[in-house]
Design a protein with these regions (language model features):
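A domain-level signal for caspase-like cysteine endopeptidase catalytic cores
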Residues: 1-58, 96-98
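Short, well-ordered alpha-helix to beta-strand connector turns
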Residues: 53-54, 92-93, 111
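Short, glycine/charged-enriched secondary-structure capping and boundary segments
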Residues: 22-23, 71-74, 110-112
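Short, T/G/N/S-enriched strand-turn elements that build extracellular solenoid repeat scaffolds
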Residues: 45-50, 68-69, 84-87, 107-108
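General structural signal for secondary-structure boundaries
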Residues: 39-44, 76-85, 158
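A short, glycine/acidic-enriched catalytic loop
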Residues: 64-91
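Active-site-proximal C-terminal subdomain of hydrolase catalytic domains
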Residues: 95-158
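Short acidic, S/G/P-rich loop/turn micro-motifs used as interaction or catalytic elements
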Residues: 12-18, 42-44, 62-71, 101-105, ...
Length: 158
């Protein structure tokens, strides 16, 4: 039996901590080991090597169509996941991409597979940019529900 190895890349940022339930209960199944969780403090080269060593990569945080922002947690680069990581991420059908406009990143890189988000509203200012009237309380409730549902069903048989 092959054990699935999961890498989680979630740059340390209080405004995206609501996503922690997506991965906090991973592992413990006979066919899954506890994930490797990276929140910052490592080089892009090490991230690339870790991606290659794992069967599935879960990437979460702030981002754009160009990739996942490093939010100052991974040295000088503004991105931790971008086009330079696509080759390492390819051929991993169970990857998860959760950041604003991850769908646009996926469209630009057709070799990538997995579950991904579109625009993700995490604060009132983002909602206002899209003419959505919502309180921070409603946004938090929606985001917490999303993270808990994904976390509860992430390892179910496909």
């Amino acid at each position: 039996i092959k054990v699935m190895k999961t890498l989680v890349i979630h740059p340390q940022d209080k405004s995206t901590d609501f996503l922690i339930p997506v991965y906090m209960n991973l592992g413990g199944f006979p066919d899954f080991e506890k994930p490797t969780i990276i929140r910052g403090g490592v080089s892009r080269d090490l991230i690339r090597e870790l991606i290659k060593q794992h069967d599935r990569v879960i990437m979460l945080g702030h981002g754009s169509p160009s990739g996942l922002f490093s939010v100052g947690q991974f040295g000088q680069s503004g991105m931790i996941i971008d086009a330079s990581m696509v080759e390492a991420l390819s051929n991993k059908p169970n990857n998860i991409y959760i950041w604003c406009n991850a769908d646009k990143f996926m469209e630009q890189h057709p070799t990538l597979q997995g579950f991904y988000s579109g625009m993700f509203i995490s604060e009132v200012g983002e909602a206002a940019m899209y003419n959505i009237k919502a309180s921070q309380e409603v946004i938090n409730e929606s985001n917490n529900l999303f993270a808990n549902v994904v976390g509860n069903y992430i390892d179910l048989d496909q």
